[in-house]
Amino acid sequence: MPGMSRHNQSVGAYGERCALRHLITAGLRPVARNWRCPHGEIDIIAWDGPVLAICEVKTRRTDTFGTPTAAVTGTKARRLRLLAARWLAETGTRADEVRFDVLSIRLTGGPPHVEHLKGAF
C-alpha cells in the first residue's frame, strides 16, 4: 500500500485477520481477500447466505483521527460500489443482493473490539 508505513500496514493486516475471524464466526463464507485491480482494493468479499457482502475493514489504535467507521467517506463508498461491479463482472459471480459492510476494529489494549456494520452504505 503506497504511502503507508510498515507499522500501519502491519496494524491493518492484523485488523483484517480479526475481521475475517469475526465474519467466519458469524457464519459468513469468505470468497476473496484483498482483491485488487488498478482502481483499488476490496478487503473481504463473503457470502452471508444468499447475500454477497463487500466488506471494508478499518483498524484504529486510537480515535485521534476519527473513528474507524468515519474513515469510510462517500468517495470510498462510491469506489467500493464500482470495484464490486468490476469483481462481479470479472469473476462471473451472480448475486441477487449485494450489501456493503464496514468492520471497525479497535486495538486499544486487551482483545480487539470488532464492530460489524451491515449495510453501511
From Swiss-Prot:
Protein name (database record): UPF0102 protein Strop_1320
Q: GO MF terms on file?
A: nucleic acid binding
**InterPro entries with a match to the protein in the record:** Restrct_endonuc-II-like, tRNA_endonuc-like_dom_sf, UPF0102_YraN-like
Organism lineage reads as: Bacteria, Bacillati, Actinomycetota, Actinomycetes, Micromonosporales
Going by the entry's taxonomy, the superkingdom of the source organism is recorded as: Bacteria
Family designation: Belongs to the UPF0102 family.
> Which Gene3D superfamilies would you find in this protein's record?
3.40.1350.10
| The species this protein was found in | Salinispora tropica (strain ATCC BAA-916 / DSM 44818 / JCM 13857 / NBRC 105044 / CNB-440)
CDD domains recorded: PoNe_Nuclease
Tell me the NCBIfam families matching this sequence.
PRK12497.1-3 (NF009150), PRK12497.3-3 (NF009154)
